[in-house]
């Protein structure tokens, strides 16, 4: 073996392990509750933290030393406070998808411990543990990863008074976010996991949303009970990698059939070493996992169902893209959108954007390039197209 290659690859592999240990120590802090218990505005000592949580003082001090060096906490007045960086990993974080990813990796560590059983038996850890993983994973991981999509729905056209169906809703966390953001929404969720549905129903009651959100048990691949245009919007997040590849196109077409205005779904694309590694670990976790899209498959399925617009999600950019397909049958020339200022319309027409759908499917970067705020210019079009 070449000595230079040995040296280079050894350094690379060592760095990978070091980064892995940082991630594991961070996940340990989340699991132990440190990020939730350390205040951001009032110092707490290691002794106080150990007593409050019932933990060994020496181990708490070791974790605090790590957290201080990595920037999660800062030392002041004889104690520790949480930094902005650390606050992103506590409950109520403004970036729930980030917290969800950390929880996801905590499950991956469990999957690794049972790799031999999963590989020999051809099943996932969820089967080996009789469904325990699935029950816990959805509220802690999947629900957190889904919340970031609510802003995209609004940008695409979802408004107060509309109806929406969430296929593979888990505990309904996304629907609760939608209901909080847009009062008056009528929401329905369908999922096969009875445990998470019951958890979601309890949360709906706690928040007074039980009359606004209807959670139903059912097979998300069977939409025959819903008539055409049954809902204004239909949505599926992190569902496709649990569907057989040969059923994915039909699933999208059924979503299109039962939607009045449009559909949303995401495609996780195995286009990097990160997603390829996650693909391996999810297959170890779940028996019914069928895999991410290749880039070619993702593009081809959108082409076959005539998707008009797609956009990338903010956190896992380039690896998970959220797609919107408009099913509303009519369109409007921009000249008939009453609240759209003439000067803005002229700028759009100069870029050959002449209809409401044309504006909604235009690249946000293009709108910025011609001096228009994407959110502002879309609002009158959304009101006109989706009453």
Predicted regions and their residues:
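N-terminal accessory segments
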Residues: 1-110
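Conserved Class I S-adenosyl-L-methionine-dependent methyltransferase catalytic core
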Residues: 66-162
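Conserved SAM/SAH-binding beta-strand->alpha-helix loop
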Residues: 193-195
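Compact, charge-rich alpha-helical regulatory domains located at protein termini
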Residues: 330-387
């Amino acid at each position: 073996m070449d000595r230079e290659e040995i040296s280079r690859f050894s350094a690379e592999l060592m760095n990978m392990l070091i980064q892995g240990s940082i991630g594991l120590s961070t996940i340990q802090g989340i699991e132990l509750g440190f990020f939730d218990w350390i205040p951001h505005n009032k110092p707490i000592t290691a002794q106080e933290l150990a007593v409050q949580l019932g933990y060994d003082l020496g181990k708490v001090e070791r974790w605090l030393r790590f957290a201080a060096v990595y920037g999660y906490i800062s030392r002041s007045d004889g104690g520790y406070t949480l930094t902005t960086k650390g606050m992103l990993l506590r409950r109520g974080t403004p970036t729930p998808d980030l917290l969800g990813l950390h929880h996801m990796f905590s499950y991956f560590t469990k999957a690794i411990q049972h790799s031999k059983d999963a590989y020999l038996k051809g099943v996932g850890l969820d089967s080996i543990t009789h469904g325990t993983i699935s029950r816990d994973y959805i509220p802690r991981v999947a629900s957190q990863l889904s919340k970031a999509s609510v802003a995209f729905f609004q940008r695409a056209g979802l408004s107060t008074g509309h109806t929406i169906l969430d296929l593979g809703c888990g505990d309904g966390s996304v629907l609760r976010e939608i209901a909080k953001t847009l009062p008056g929404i009528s929401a329905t969720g369908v999922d096969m996991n009875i445990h998470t549905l019951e958890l979601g129903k309890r949360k709906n009651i706690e928040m007074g949303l039980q009359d606004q959100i209807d959670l139903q048990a059912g097979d998300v691949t069977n939409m025959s009970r819903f008539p055409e245009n049954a809902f204004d919007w239909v949505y599926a997040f992190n569902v496709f990698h649990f569907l057989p590849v040969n059923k994915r196109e039909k699933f999208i077409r059924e979503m299109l059939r039962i939607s009045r205005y449009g559909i949303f779904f995401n495609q996780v694309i195995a286009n990097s070493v990160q997603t390829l590694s996650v693909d391996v670990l999810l297959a170890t976790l779940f028996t019914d996992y069928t895999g991410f899209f290749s880039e070619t498959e993702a593009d081809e399925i959108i082409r076959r169902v005539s998707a008009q617009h797609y956009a990338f999600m903010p956190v896992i950019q380039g690896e998970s893209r959220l797609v919107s397909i408009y099913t509303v049958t009519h369109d409007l020339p921009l000249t008939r959108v009453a609240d759209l200022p003439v000067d803005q319309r002229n700028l759009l027409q100069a870029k050959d954007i002449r209809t409401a759908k044309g504006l909604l499917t235009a690249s946000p970067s293009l709108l910025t390039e011609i001096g228009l705020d994407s959110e502002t210019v879309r609002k009158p079009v959304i009101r006109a197209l989706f009453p």
